[in-house]
Every structure is written in C-alpha cells, then in structure tokens.
C-alpha cells in the first residue's frame, strides 16, 4: 500500500530525511502528490514515539477512496482529519464522470432583433419526452442546497471552477442563518453528446426543517421525481422519512442519494447508512447514487439517473387560445380546424412572490456575467432591453395541459376572475423570459396589477378556448382543501373530455390542490412606536403572498393599540417571518409570547376523535360551564443532538423545568449523544430551545415533529392594570402553574411601571378569582411639611384631604393607564421565564 504520511495538525508533509526507508528511495526532499513511497512502521515508531499520531490516506493511484484521482492534491492531504492507523481501501468509490452529458445554457441574445426567434426556438426544442421535473428533498443539513449548487455548476449555469456555495438560498435571512426557507426552482439544459438530444431538467431545492414542510409538499406537486438525499455520516433521520412518505403519497419516482462522501472515514459508515436506508424505505442499496458536492463528484451520474428513471410529464399538448396563433378569418375552414384542436390550459399555481419579497435581488451576484441578465429589485432585465415589470405578482406554475404565452387571458378557477399574463419564462438561473410555457414545463408568469386577495396558492389557471369549453362548478374558497394526488395523465384527461363530449361540451377540471395546513403557534405582532398599523399590515400582506401558510387576524389591545395575530407552522417559522419583516420591509415589531394552538371538545365529546376537536385561544376562550367537556394540549417529540459533555445539564433542565419525559438516548459517535423527549409544545416555546443552545454553547441542535394532542387542565389567565384588561398579556396555562406564572408577570410590571399620581392596582385573574395582586404606589406630596408643631389632628386633616383627592383622581382615571413598549416587553419576557 502506498501511503501519504501527514501530520495530524495539517501543517506540512513529512520530510523523507527522517525515515531511512523513505530516504533510500528518494534521496531526501519532501514528497509530492506523485512521488510517495511505502513507509515502514519501524521508522514511524522510532521517529514519532509513543502517544503521537499521524494521518494516513491511501494514494489515489491505488484502489480509490471516496473520490476520483483528479481530486488528489497535497493540500487535500495536508488538511485530512486525524484517524490514526485506520488504513482502508474503499469499496464505495464514486464512479468517474462518463462525460456523456454537457450543460448547454441558452442565453438571451444581445441583439433585440434576434430575441423573438430565440424564444421560439427555445420552446420548440422541448417536447414532453425531454422534460424532467425533480424535487431535491432531505433532512436538515444533509446537503440539498450545496448539491443543487454543484448541479448548476455542472450544467454551466454557474462558473464550474468556483467554490460550491448556496446560490439557491436567495433570501437574506437564508444567507444569515445558513438554512433553506423557501423552495427555489432552476431550469437546467443538458445535451447528450452521443445523440445531441437536449433535455430540460427543472430542479426544485426544498427546505429540510419541519416548520417548512408546506414548501416541500407544494414542490412535490409539481414534480414527477424526488431525489432523496441522505448524509452518509448522519444516516436516516426524522425528516428523511417525512420527505420519503410525502413523495410516496404523490406517487413520485424516488432516487436515493448519499451526500458528503468526502467526509467518510471508513466503509462501515457507508454500509451502516445504506442498511438504514434499505430497512426504513425499501430502496435497494445498489440503486443509491454516491455524490460529493464539494468535490463535484457523482453529479453527472445523478443527472443521468434523473433522465433515465424519472418519467416525463404526460399532459395534453397544443395551443390554448386563438391569440397564440396568427390571425384567421372567422369563417375560414382553417380556423374551424384549429379551434377543434385547441387544448384548454390547466396549470397549477404552487408559489407566488412580489418584487419586494422575491429573494431574486442578489440572484445574479455569483453567476457568470455572460449567462445572467441584470437583476434589480427582484426583477430580471433581458439583454434586449425588455424587463419584467415590478408592479404586480409573479406566479410559479407547472403547466399540466396546453400552452400559456404573453397576452394569454387566464381564469383563476376558484375565484373565477380573469387576468392577462404579461410575461412568461423559466428560471435559468434567474428570471429568463421565453415565448411560451408548454405542457410539462415549470416556469413563472407575471400578472400586472393582480391583488393579493385574488391569489390562492394551489389554484388552477385555465383557459376556455371556445364556447364548448366550460369550467366545472366548485365550492368557493381556498383550493388547499383537497388532498393532492398524482397529476392526471393525458389518457385520463382525454377520457374525461370524451365523457362530456357526448353533450357537445368539454368540461375543464381543476387540478387537486394541497392539503390544508393548520398553524400550531400564534403570536401578536404590534407596530413599533411611531409606526402606523397600516404600514405593518401592507408589509404582512406582501410577505404572505410569498408565504401563504401564515394566517392573519386583527387584534385590538388597550395598551398597545391595533395589531395582528399571526399563525405559524412552528417557532422557527415565526422567527424567520419576523426577520423578513425587518430585512425586506424595515418593519420593527413587538411580538407577544408565542401561544400554541390548544383544542377543546364539547361535553360528552370524544377527545381522541380529531373531528370533534375545536381550536381555542385567549380571544375565543370558553369555560367548562359554557359547554366545554375537555381541553387538549399539544405534545411533541423533541430530538436533541448534543456533545456528550453538555448532556447532563440539558437533561436536568428538560426533566425538571420543562415537563419532559425521556424516550430514547443513544451515543452517536463517541462524542455526541442523541436524546428524545416527549414534552408539551408550550414548554418548548417558553424557553427549552434557548436552554439547549445556552447550555451547549450553541453546539447542540433541536428538532421536533408534528404535535399530537392530550387532555390537560387548562385555564385562561388575564392581567388587569387599573381595572383595564391587557389582552396582550392574557395567556393560557395549566391550572397548577397559574399562580406562579401570575406572580412573575405582576412582579415584572410592578418593577417597570412608572409611578403616577394615583395608586395603580395590578391583578391577575383566573375567571373572576384574583390569584395575584400588587400595587404601584402613587407619588405623594408632603402636605405636612409646613406644620412643625401643634396638635396631631392638624396633620390628620391634611392627610385625609389628600386621601380624598387621590380617590377622586382614581375614579376619573379608570383604565387610562398607558404602557410603554419597554414595560410590556419586560412583562412579556417574564412569561417565558422558568
């Protein structure tokens, strides 16, 4: 075995002068990447001595490790991790690229006169047989975005010689947090060298966190295949299985992919992960694709598997509007023939954005100058002078049947409203206008002047080419009420048309939408001092176009004024939304403590029946005497992965302060421990996440699954200041914790409220019962300062007059106390303390 001996610190290569066996072969000097010789253990032992370790890596001239020979270098060896005498020859080497595929990006011509012809040729070259739609799904931090970036570089959309980054993470908050929040689409053009066949591969990079599972479900609806990524060292994790089952529900072709093969230390790690994947999903080990995004290996094989195994779309092809054809005489035979061949447009709207919340502003920053048009304010300007306008809404669609072009008037199925399409195109890798989007393609459409209230994610965009075409009447409301199934095939669509054709008309069916998602975390958002609620409402509405899973309701608080109650899919979702409000719209907001979604059932109801459960909150609270049979509290399974030295502190806090129950604990790799707790979602909101981060100095990670509901003894606690209810401080808690919780809030208010000319009573109520009370004493003037001697009755008279005056002032100032945001923020912080 030829070996490269490298110091564990990664400082430099060993010099041969220290080793007789090496010196005899090389006559001194430092070895290079191509001049390594065998080193005997005797020389190493005599030079290093006991207790010192070296890193050994087999040369790529021998049977390969996890990579190709082209990736070998002295720098790679010098930075290798230390693993002592773990010498091995990999049986899971990544195959070298066959160089059968080449990226052929099609650039907009600089000459405006050539642009129209270019757009037409771009579409003509892509029949459905040459289109592939694939979503990239995985657990958190398993390498989805990095692999997507490497795929874009392989296809020449990004510089091939650049370092692999995170191009598809376009939002500022994504770049700062280092996670994917929004699913991003990019169309890749590949050509087979042998045959010259060109393929259009639409890649959708999806988030991995459970809070953004709604993004994943929408992306899967627009795909025929899913690349299921698994980190070779982490193995199969919770979201891996969640994404697998989501893809299975959609009847998608699943391609298993192992990522980060450059981090592997032994074959045992690969074999363990392959066994996990096969046992948990049934995907065969021999079908797994090995990749390394950082070294850009295995990318061509992944693309080849996408082309070979993912089925092409099967929609009905054809024009969908007479405006898409040259002008014809109304009574001509050619026109009648063409009208019979028109195919109604059916397109699934699975994402929307505005120029303010697009995340496309920095899209061209890292792309080659020759391949990306100028990007400004979320819009892409074509080289020919045309630009995608800003004042409107962009929609990301998957065309099922027909064709959509600029100027096509489409009907939104569930609202029945018609809007004209101004621009269409693909994302390549930024907004890239084309002449049309045909059946099977994924691309964007732009609607000028479209209002947010007219847009429903999951709606069907359609056209009625002739009078014989009609739309099926559906119930009004958001389209997310139906569960998504596999897109109808051309045969199924044709059979539907045949069934209705006997009556002389053709019924256009809507595309099934997405499953309804219920928010699990609620928080009140109030504008910063000096900011009007209208500005906050406009910013929230624009952001909700891009994030439709957020629910919005109006709030009115006597202390804070008007606000909004927003519902989110999780705590990370709430934090990200708040950060996007600040980064994209400059809105600083005061956020009340997050409240989880509690449920109740009527008297004589079954708590185990989800159909009988109804949501309850502080705004619509009902007591048992009002017909409530039982309250239900959400519980989650929290998974903590922490360095072992921090385990005791985290475990103690989880069991004692956050009502956690340990379900599982296992050592991962000798240095890290995985622990699973069953705990209330409310306790997670009140500070368990912060405790995990602070106890582990930021090294531990925490994830949780979807909540399940269990019965609990809940009460609503109200805070009253000077006889005025402060709705922002009302909360739902367990009955036995209400007193402790109340004293903490009342104590914080007493410390931070400014004194006034009258006493301010502070009360915490459960129903009509006072469970905690404090008083902020009023300022008192020393009315006896000028009385130096004499009868005490003179002083008592002054004191009594002062007391009566205070009582008169108190009667006039009932409920008129004004809270500064700093005071309320301190009280809100007390609600999350343990």
Curated annotation (Swiss-Prot):
It is found in: Mitochondrion inner membrane. It comes from Leishmania major. Transmembrane segments: none annotated. Residues 475-507 are annotated as: Disordered. The keyword Membrane applies. Disulfide bonds: none annotated. The keyword Protein biosynthesis applies. Pfam families: EFG_C (PF00679), GTP_EFTU (PF00009), LepA_C (PF06421). Promotes mitochondrial protein synthesis. May act as a fidelity factor of the translation reaction, by catalyzing a one-codon backward translocation of tRNAs on improperly translocated ribosomes. Binds to mitochondrial ribosomes in a GTP-dependent manner. GTP binds at residues 138-145, 205-209, 259-262. InterPro entries: EF-4 (IPR006297), EFG_III/V (IPR035647), EFG_V-like (IPR000640), LepA_C_sf (IPR038363), LepA_CTD (IPR013842), LepA_IV (IPR035654), P-loop_NTPase (IPR027417), Small_GTP-bd (IPR005225). GO terms for molecular function: GTP binding; GTPase activity; mitochondrial ribosome binding. PANTHER family: TRANSLATION FACTOR GUF1, MITOCHONDRIAL, TRANSLATION FACTOR GUF1-RELATED. Keywords: GTP-binding, Hydrolase, Membrane, Mitochondrion, Mitochondrion inner membrane, Nucleotide-binding, Protein biosynthesis, Transit peptide. Residues 129-314 form the tr-type G domain. GO terms for biological process: positive regulation of translation; translation. It catalyses: GTP + H2O = GDP + phosphate + H(+). Residues 488-507 have a biased composition (Low complexity). HAMAP family: LepA. This is Translation factor GUF1 homolog, mitochondrial. Belongs to the TRAFAC class translation factor GTPase superfamily. Classic translation factor GTPase family. LepA subfamily. It is a peripheral membrane protein.
